[in-house]
Amino acid sequence: MRRRVFSSQDWRASGWDGMGFFSRRTFCGRSGRSCRGQLVQVSRPEVSAGSLLLPAPQAEDHSSRILYPRPKSLLPKMMNADMDAVDAENQVELEEKTRLINQVLELQHTLEDLSARVDAVKEENLKLKSENQVLGQYIENLMSASSVFQTTDTKSKRK
């Protein structure tokens, strides 16, 4: 998060606070835009021997020049109500996500079971096909052998 600090020339955002600290208002957020301000205290710069020590400016009422956030007494009530609504909404969403995840897991297990069953049926089908082929050849051999016997039987009866 970027923090933009107003320069000391911005009389609305900075000034001496009367306790020896230089107050500077910073704004958090992208491109210097934000909805909340922070007050940063920076200690007074060291005075060199060649400079003059000027007295701290008199504390004046600059309240009309500085934008203050909403009164603190309203914030907790509004935030608690909003947070309760958000928490309830998040709880409902979390329960819905959990239900959907469980449903997906159950469907995955069912799909795995069906896939295993399909594989088993394919194996059984191949096994039965090979057995049918063997039985078919056996039947053909029996029929050809029986036809040989039938032809010999009819010839023997004719004699």
Swiss-Prot record:
What stretch or stretches form a coiled coil here?
78-146
Family annotation (InterPro entries) = SCOC (IPR019357)
Name the UniProt key words of this record, in alphabetical order. Answer: Coiled coil, Cytoplasm, Golgi apparatus, Membrane
**What is the name of the protein in this document?**
Short coiled-coil protein
Q: In which tissues is it expressed?
A: Widely expressed with highest levels in brain, heart and skeletal muscle.
- What does the record say about its membrane topology? Peripheral membrane protein
Report TM segments: none
Question: Subunit info?
Answer: Homodimer. Interacts with ARL1, ARL2 and ARL3. Directly interacts with FEZ1 and UVRAG. The interaction with UVRAG is reduced by amino acid starvation, but the complex is stabilized in the presence of FEZ1. Interacts with NRBF2.
The impact of changing residue 93 to V is:
Causes trimerization and impairs interaction with FEZ1 coiled coil but does not impair interaction with full-length FEZ1
Asked whether the keyword Glycoprotein is assigned, the reply is no
The family database entries (PANTHER family) matched by this protein are listed as: SHORT COILED COIL PROTEIN, SHORT COILED-COIL PROTEIN
Q: Which Pfam families match?
A: DUF2205
Q: Which Gene3D superfamilies match?
A: 1.20.5.170
Consequence of changing residue 97 to L: Causes trimerization and impairs interaction with FEZ1 coiled coil but does not impair interaction with full-length FEZ1
